[in-house]
Amino acid sequence: MNRFFGMLLVIAATLAGLVLLSAGFYLAAGWLGWGFNALTGWISGSPGVSRAAVYYGASVANVVTLLLVVLMISSSLLTVAERKWSALIQNRIGANRIKVFGSALGGIPFLAADALKMLTKERIETTGRTRVLYELAPMLAFAPVFALFAIIPVGQGIELNQIPGLAGAAAAGAVEQIALQVSRTDTGLLYLFAIASLQVYGTALAGWASNNKLALLGGVRASSQMISYEVSLGLSLVGTMIAYRTLRLEEMVVAQGTPVLGPVPALGLLLQPIGFLIFFASAFAETKRAPFDLPEGESEIVGYFVEYSGMKFGLLFLAEFAEIVVLAGVITAVFLGGWHPILFEGWLRQNLTPFWFAAVGAGAFIAKMIVMMWLQLTIRWLLPRFRFDQIQKLCWKLLLPAALVNVFVTGGALLLDPSGQLLAWIGILTIVVIAVLTAAVGRAPAPAAGHGAAHAAAGH
Amino acid sequence: MPYQLENRPPDLRESMYFPEIIRGIGTITKHFLKNLFFSRDANPDILARKRGGFGHSDNVTLQYPEERAPYAPAYRGLHRLVPREDGKPRCVACYMCATICPAQCIYIEAAEYPDDPVEKYPAKFVIDELRCIVCGFCVEACPKDAIRMDSGEHTPPSYERSAQIWDEKRLLRGPPVSYQYDPWLRRGSPSIPPDKLEEMRARAKPFPTVATDEASQTPGFSVRALAAEAKDRAQAARK
């Protein structure tokens, strides 16, 4: 029971820590934005408030806090979490032999050991490789993931003068709002599709430039798989674009806070359950992890990274985990209500200052992201891998038609009822159908262990 | 228990993948939460460990160097030559063990006590532990209960093969044992001082008829203690 209460305490402390962390992020964005404004004013000799300067300063702060802290730290922690969580799933203990002051600290010190190992390993470079492409591939695998996280709206926008210490900075509306989002572009989801389709170059080039047949096979498999799933990935989000009438992720999040059926907010999960499932499956295939880990296969081809060693392999390896984080971020923003803390939202909004409400929201976003990362790791340990033809069949024969139907149903429902209530009812109906299908027993249960079963056993 | 699965194509629900996957996530989550929130039963005996129910994790891991599973009472460990109370081996160099040994790993050279015209003793008693197949036949064959495998130890590793050849000096160890029917106790022996003989006779006991009694004499291992522990555990669980 001690562990039970300890775990509750850890979870509560984690949530509180996320809120405090987000508050720190807002402070950094606000202060750096204001400082940037003061600096440009001093250089150009014209004191005053510049919209662009505040926006750029806040963006620089967000690059550091969101990309380097949230994305990098959580993707490196995921390498430990994969071991620890899989151990919990499989009734094991998991990595616990590195102890700091007698405590294994949940295996987190393994992060340092892994990094040290990757950085100090011998670099082995094959002679037949294509030098430029070979060196370029790990960067190309990693950079798009990094760029993808730039449009994830982790925190809502608040006015500059609502940030503690900056009350007299600029009147509301005078400058851009401070948000925990590196870049607020009009293109939004289109940018997401464009950058996501760049990911395939890293793996394809890694396989091709290594001058190794097995690596080439891995690269070719990666290309065909990722290009196929890009189609259903794109189509699955078209429904949400129609439903929220915008491409911008931050506007989608705001739209998800509005109630649609009584007090129930218009979550993406509610309006687009089919879109959610298709997007999740397609994006999972894009991350190239089990059950879609065809580009790597220890038993047949080793993988597209077979000729990489040391930190170059580490970068390819870390890119997969960073993709998990980005996928979790996109799903949270598009389907799970983004920074809306859903529970007690009205009460929180009334009783907290805008700054702290935004911090709570950003903490809720990161907490939802953690749940989605956990879900992805769980599925990775749940399923065996698909065969290659099954992967293609799943994409072209199941996900793609379902996505097309989803687009037309969404469009039709919104044409009939622009308020979205019809769409919400259709979503609820879909969820009920899926729940019934899940609860219904499919296969006949195993025969009871008795004499009859023993006769059925081979060799009896 | 293996059973035959009907070989049929997946039905509609299975070919939709998602319902089955959601069910699988449910199963996995149950294990995850149970193992996350509840701690392992610290009992190193995995079979007796409480697990699975509410309040206990499903974990079966044994943290090996720190926790060790107790060996079964019948565990055949490293041989030992059982000493008498006066420190001499009970062995009378009858060659029974060397004869029955299927691996032929026992070498004995018999000798006689200079002052005792009846008893023999092994001048050399060598077991090649590398050849030993740990069958326990030598223990069964011994008419004097002079060789046992009740030490509860593994053969310790070594860098030289020669260190695995155990002679009588290394084999003769562990608690001494005396039985009332021992001939040297009944008729006396010039090689045993009279007062020592009295002490040995006093400590002699009838030959055991219950197998566990023998194992209970193993140093550092006791079936009775284990049984008592299990009883305590059961009582604690009932409360």
Curated annotation (Swiss-Prot), chain B:
Residues 81-111, 123-152 form the 4Fe-4S ferredoxin-type domain. [4Fe-4S] cluster 1 binds at C91, C94, C97, C142. It is found in: Cell inner membrane. It catalyses: a quinone + NADH + 5 H(+)(in) = a quinol + NAD(+) + 4 H(+)(out). Binds 2 [4Fe-4S] clusters per subunit. It is a peripheral membrane protein. Its EC number is 7.1.1.-. Keywords: 4Fe-4S, Cell inner membrane, Cell membrane, Iron, Iron-sulfur, Membrane, Metal-binding, NAD, Quinone, Repeat, Translocase, Ubiquinone. GO terms for molecular function: 4 iron, 4 sulfur cluster binding; iron ion binding; NADH:ubiquinone reductase (non-electrogenic) activity; quinone binding. It comes from the Bacteria. [4Fe-4S] cluster 2 binds at C101, C132, C135, C138. The keyword Repeat applies. Its cofactor is [4Fe-4S] cluster. GO terms for cellular component: plasma membrane. Its main location: membrane. It is an enzyme of class 7 (translocase). Belongs to the complex I 23 kDa subunit family. NDH-1 is composed of 14 different subunits. Subunits NuoA, H, J, K, L, M, N constitute the membrane sector of the complex. NDH-1 shuttles electrons from NADH, via FMN and iron-sulfur (Fe-S) centers, to quinones in the respiratory chain. The immediate electron acceptor for the enzyme in this species is believed to be ubiquinone. Couples the redox reaction to proton translocation (for every two electrons transferred, four hydrogen ions are translocated across the cytoplasmic membrane), and thus conserves the redox energy in a proton gradient. This is NADH-quinone oxidoreductase subunit I 1.
